Structure formats: structure tokens, C-alpha cells
Amino acid sequence: MKDFLEDYKKSVSERGSEGIPPLPLNAKQVQAVVEILTKDPTNAAFAKELLIHRVSPGVDEGAKVKAEFLAKLSQKKLECVHISALEATTLLGTMLGGYNVEPLIMGLESQDKNIAKESAKALKTTLLVYGSFDKIAAMSKTNALAKEVLESWANAEWFLNKEPLNECIEACVFKIDGETNTDDLSPASDAFTRSDIPLHAKAMLKNRIENYEQRIKAIKTKGVPVAYVGDVVGTGSSRKSATNSIMWHFGKDIPFVPNKRSGGIVIGGVIAPIFFATCEDSGALPIVADVKDLKEGDLIKIYPYKGEITLNDKVVSTFKLEPETLLDEVRASGRIPLIIGRGLTNKARKFLGLGESEAFKKPSAPKSDAKGYTLAQKIVGHACGVKGILPGTYCEPKVTTVGSQDTTGAMTRDEVKELASLKFDAPFVLQSFCHTAAYPKPSDVSLHATLPGFITQRGGVALHPGDGVIHTWLNRMGLPDTLGTGGDSHTRFPLGISFPAGSGLVAFAAVTGTMPLNMPESVLVRFKGEMNPGITLRDLVNAIPYYAIKKGLLTVEKKGKINVFNGRILEIEGLPDIKMEQAFELSDASAERSAAACVVRLNKEPMIEYLKSNIKLIDEMIASGYEDKETLKKRRDAMQAWVDNPVLLEPDSNAQYAAVIEIDVAEITEPILACPNDPDDVATLSEVLADTTGKRPHAIDEVFIGSCMTNIGHFRAFGEIVKNAPPSQARLWVVPPSKMDEQELINEGYYAIFGAAGARTEVPGCSLCMGNQARVRDNAVVFSTSTRNFDNRMGRGAKVYLGSAELGAACALLGRIPTKEEYMNLVSEKLESQKDKIYRYMNFNLMENFRL
């Protein structure tokens, strides 16, 4: 006990010097607190405060110890002079759900009427009861308090007893001009601290603005709530840590939940869809409104019901809150609590024979004259058990596949615990370790050791560090025409559809097997024509924003930004026979368009080929000891069932789209690349070389071939171009996306070629793409095959081009961006005659002696 007190007070002092609270108590520490309460009266008052306020709720390991102790006190099996049986019952009611539910149900039958009543009172506000609902329902036939609990749930007292949003909210503006991406709010270099919300929040905006700590501190002294304001807010990764950081600085404490806050206000001219949804989930108020007349330090009034923002009693901006349920979401402390609570209310009403509740705002049916459905609308409809879902419709589709990666996995674990879940209802949940495998910090090593068991115990599947990028694996676990999600913005399945999300919603989807969705509109991109020699799929990826800019549907400028893709589904057709790995290049890059999701219309044949390969992969995973075996077997069987009867959904010919962009690939006669530092700022090779402003530098310092945007064909092509050439003029990084790609490239001799070229190779994984481990040199000019090129992402001050591996090879050879002629000559000489050999994909079922 003495050691615990000394260690804890030391931790309080150390973290206090950084302006942050101590970490929540772990199970061992909670056990020490319990011992102090029962054996050390001198420190009991301090220990009681820790037990009440410093233990995470739900099914956290510490919560189990806390609940067991309080249950013994409530049931009078143990006495503690500092906590009465009645107070213990009250404290059980603060733990949200999980380990506290069973003791509270038992309390309904207590001989002590006060404890029985207090148990009922606690259960009325406990939403995370899951299977225990049936137990309470059965009890209600003979137990008046159990019936009272059901009636309270049915009447939505848990919701109606919360204060609605005020008619007028006074706030002080904290404004970041231009675009704030999630890497600004949650720097990748600090990814290892993300689950420690207060510590991670200290890094918010450190790479974006000078004197960031002073600015944040100063704005909080105004004595009113702070509104985070920007022209474009939340683009980029799906990391919930970005939202967590804003809420830690500007939100409100959550009673009895340590080191976490909710609430907060975000106002943006454009708010990226994943970030917007994460704000909804977390109880924040996201508002899309013109912000040009708002300046830092302005004391504004926000009228959420009228949709006005005033400054000095003058209206400076107007808005309409969307979705319609947003006010309910804020009142319920978030969209996820609202969905869970609303479901509990409906379940109780159904059991009691009551009609639908009138307590909640009902989403209006969309007004549409649409006669048909797009492919995306049909896939979502299929997940909802209907023919299709029109834009504007609120729905809760079934989630078939869920992904979690390591830099968000610890947060997802915490969210699963808070949801009081011991089992996943989603059919397939995959956890990877791709962002931290190469250079793990001590916290990463701990995560690698503890997170796999947490996932597999709940029926999920855990990969190993070094296996490779999550998307390379998760794509192979998908099923045609099904819906999924994942805690990474590049969760963009090439078959079916996926809506990436923050870790809170990912946890919800994994736990419940469903996710909330306000169905977006779709933008159709239709390719036609024949590709010219030397043109790659990556050029088609960059052609999408290139042609959108031509049509006035996309602007690079952030102020008053136009982006037709933002928050919509990108639907792609016209390339029906490309391989699944190629289709993923297209769907993956929809993240950089800020699209909500993407679907690629393909024929059956590439899907059948892909699934046959994936069935073999799963067989080898089972043979190699990957867990959970039953989950893997079920997914393998589902794949085989589809291969045996391959039927695909098709869009209706009269489906309606928000916009249609037609791209004749025959018009593309040279590579298209994204320029520093904006994935929307695309230009042809000739346009880049014609730029003499210095904004598009021509000399290349470093080249990166890797990320989820690559497949084995890219590495072969790169190898063939640099083979037998002098060592690269640029610093060269080569990192395959999976250990299967790595082994095959070694077998084929390409690693020898990479070594001769002077390449630095790493274990399969994300490598430079996220910039959370190894980074390029400060101020380097980089050519990369990775996903995005935000400021400071790959390296401080780095200027990053995005394009194909083939163009990257030319840059590596020359140490500069080649001319169109130089590039075409290289491709023609090195690749054209052996394209079929180079661009072969990983069909494991056809590979002799394939083993993991």
C-alpha cells in the first residue's frame, strides 16, 4: 500500500508538472486502493476519491476490481466504514455498464428497500446492459422495481432528464486559417501517446502554428466556451485522437470517467466527413458555416435552432444543423450513446407492448424523384435488408468487416471497454500492427504484446507485427456487395463498400455489428477509352481531381474551397476487368478526395480470382496459428459460398448522381502527379517542369516506394527500371505492403536489385507514409507512391510529390523529375516488352508451395 501511494503521488507530481492529470488506475492499483479503504483509515479518504473518479468504466480491468468490491459492500458481504452499502450501490450506477450490471440487478431483489430502490435508480440511467435486458424483463413480471426500470427506459427518462442545447451559446473563436488536417490536430510523430488523451492533446497544432501552447492557453482564459474555427477542418486520417484533442482543450469533463471529455464546438466552411461523424459520436457540435467574417478572439453567439452566428448582435454567418438528429446527439452526449439508448428505449417499449417513442427526433424521409439506385445505394440497401437507400436517408446497416490498426487500436480497445463489450457481434474484426512494426517504441512493444489477446478473446483476428499494411490484408478478408468500416481513412474496400470511421465508431461497429449512416449522395466517375503506353493506374487516380478541376468541381484554394467529392460517395465505372489490387488504387485514393466512401464497378471474374486466392490465404493463416480460428473459418466459408454462386449487384440505368465526371483515358498522354503539398494540386509532368516559381521543385532528394497504394507489380516495375543502373541519385526507400510481397520479391531476385540501387528496405508496413516513425530529412523534396502529402507529414518542411512507382524509378535514376520523353523512353525500354511478367498479382492458390 505504501509503495502504491508513493508511486501514485510521484506520478501525479510528474504529470502535474506537464499540466495533465495522472493516468487512470489499472487493476493492480485499484486493488491497492481497495486494501487502503479496508485497512488504512489514514489514507482512506484519498483512496475513496481515487476509486470514485480515477477508474475507467465499462469492462476495463480496473472496473472489474472496482465493481466486485462495490458489489460486496452493496450486498453487505463486506463492510467499509468509508463507503456504506447504499453509497456503494450509488457508485455502481456511475460505471456505465459491464461489470456493474449484474450486482445492480441483484440489488433489485435486496431485502434492504433503500438498496433495492437505489439499484433501480442506477439501472434507469445505465444503457450498456446488452443481454441483461432479458433478465430484467423476466424479473419485471414479479418485481415491481424491475418493471419500473423497464418503464423508465421505455419513457426515455435517461434522455429527457438531460438538458437540451441552449437557445443561444456564447463562445470565443479560436481560428486556424486555411485547412486543418487531422495530422495537425493529432501529429503522427506522437501517435504512440494517442490513447493517453491529455498527454496527446499537448501536441495539438505543434507543427501547424507558432506559439501553439500560448494561443490555446490564452483563448481558454476568456471564461466562455471555445469554438474551434477553420476554413477547412478535419481532412485526412480518420484518427479520433484529433477530435479527442479538441475536446480535451475545449470540452467538458465527463463525470466518473477519467481523462476524457465530451462536447466542444467546431465550425468549418468545410468539415471532412469522417471528422464530422467523429464529432457527432463524441457529443461535440459540428457546424458547417461560412467563417470568413470570424476572427480569433471574437466573442460570438451561436443560435443552433435559428441557424445564426452573431458578432456584436450582427448576423455574420448562417447555417443549418445536419443531420436532423444532431441536437438529440448533443443532448445524449454523442451519437453512439443516442443510438444505444434509443435502441434500449425501443426494446423496452416493444416488451411492454407500447408504440414507438416520441422522445426522439425522427429523420425525415428524403425528398427525391429518383427512380433508380446507384451501386453504392444498392450495397447499403443490401446491408439494411432493402433494395436500396436513397441519399439523405438515415440507416443502420449491418457491418460485415471491421478493421483496426495499431496507432488507433489502443483507443479502439478503450472504446470497446467503455461499451462494456466482451464479444464482437461483427462477423469479422481484424487488428493489424503495420504503423509501428519497423521501429517500435516501448509503448508499441507493450501494445504488440497485449492487444492481440484482447481482440482474439472477443472473436477478432489479430495479425503480427511485420505482416504488413492493414489494407492489404483487410481487402483480402472482404466479401462482394457487403459493407464495412475501419479505424483508418484508407479503409476503402475494392469490393463492396466501406465507410472509414474514428475509433469510437469502429468499436461500436465491432461490438454491435452495425453502424449509423446518413446516406450520402454519389459522384460518378466514368472512364472510357484505351490507356496509352506508359500511363499507369496511378495516373488515372490523379486524373480524377485533374478533370474535376477542369470542370470547376474542385479547387485547390482552401478559402471558399469547392470539392464535389467531400462527404459524397465516389462511384467509379468503365474499368470492369482490372484486378482487385488495381481497383484498390482507385478506391484508396478516394480518401484524398475527402469522399465518404468509394465503390468500383467490376465484373465477376476479377472478384472470383481474388477470392480464390484469399481462401488459400485464410487456410494458411489457420495452419500457421492465427486466431480466432473459428472467425477465419466462417469468413473462408462465406467466400467459398460466393465463389460457388457469384451474383453481383448492378446500378440502375436511371440512378441519379450529384455530378458525373467522364474521363477519356486516351487523352492522358503523360503521367499526372500530385504536387507539394496537396493531393488535390495535380499536374501533368510537362506542367510541373514548366513551373519556374519554385513551388514545384524539380530536383528530387528522396524517393519512397511503398504504402497501401502499392502492390507487387509496382516493385517489379521499379526494380526493372533501376536494374543495372548506377546507384540512385536520390535517397531511396523500398517497403512492400505485405510479408507475402516481400518474400516473393526476394524469391524473384528483386531485393538484390534494390540493394544494388542503394535502397533502404524495412519490414513490410506503412513506413514513411504516415511519418510516425522513420521520416525523410528536413526540407527534403520527395517523390512518393504513398497516400497523401500534407505539410510536415513525411518530414518537417518536406515537399512531397505523389505518383506512380514507374515515375518514382525515373526520379531515383536521375535525381530529378524526368521530362516526358525521358520517362517514356525508360518505360518503353525497360517495361513494355515484359508487362505480363511484371504486372502479375499474388494469386496464392496458384503459387507453388505457398506458405505464410
Curated annotation (Swiss-Prot):
Belongs to the aconitase/IPM isomerase family. Monomer. NCBIfam families: acnB (TIGR00117), PRK09238.1 (NF006690). Coiled coil: none annotated. Pfam families: Aconitase (PF00330), Aconitase_2_N (PF06434), Aconitase_B_N (PF11791). This is Aconitate hydratase B. Pathway: Carbohydrate metabolism; tricarboxylic acid cycle; isocitrate from oxaloacetate: step 2/2; Organic acid metabolism; propanoate degradation. Its EC number is 4.2.1.3, 4.2.1.99. Binds 1 [4Fe-4S] cluster per subunit. Substrate binds at residues 194, 237-239, 405-407, 489, 788, 793. Involved in the catabolism of short chain fatty acids (SCFA) via the tricarboxylic acid (TCA)(acetyl degradation route) and probably via the 2-methylcitrate cycle I (propionate degradation route). Catalyzes the reversible isomerization of citrate to isocitrate via cis-aconitate. Catalyzes the hydration of 2-methyl-cis-aconitate to yield (2R,3S)-2-methylisocitrate. The apo form of AcnB functions as a RNA-binding regulatory protein. Its cofactor is [4Fe-4S] cluster. It catalyses: citrate = D-threo-isocitrate; (2S,3R)-3-hydroxybutane-1,2,3-tricarboxylate = 2-methyl-cis-aconitate + H2O. The keyword DNA repair does not apply. One of its GO terms (cellular component) is cytosol. [4Fe-4S] cluster binds at residues 708, 766, 769. GO terms for molecular function: 2-methylisocitrate dehydratase activity; 4 iron, 4 sulfur cluster binding; aconitate hydratase activity; metal ion binding; mRNA 3'-UTR binding; mRNA binding. CDD domains: AcnB, AcnB_Swivel. Keywords: 4Fe-4S, Iron, Iron-sulfur, Lyase, Metal-binding, RNA-binding, Tricarboxylic acid cycle. GO terms for biological process: propionate catabolic process, 2-methylcitrate cycle; tricarboxylic acid cycle.
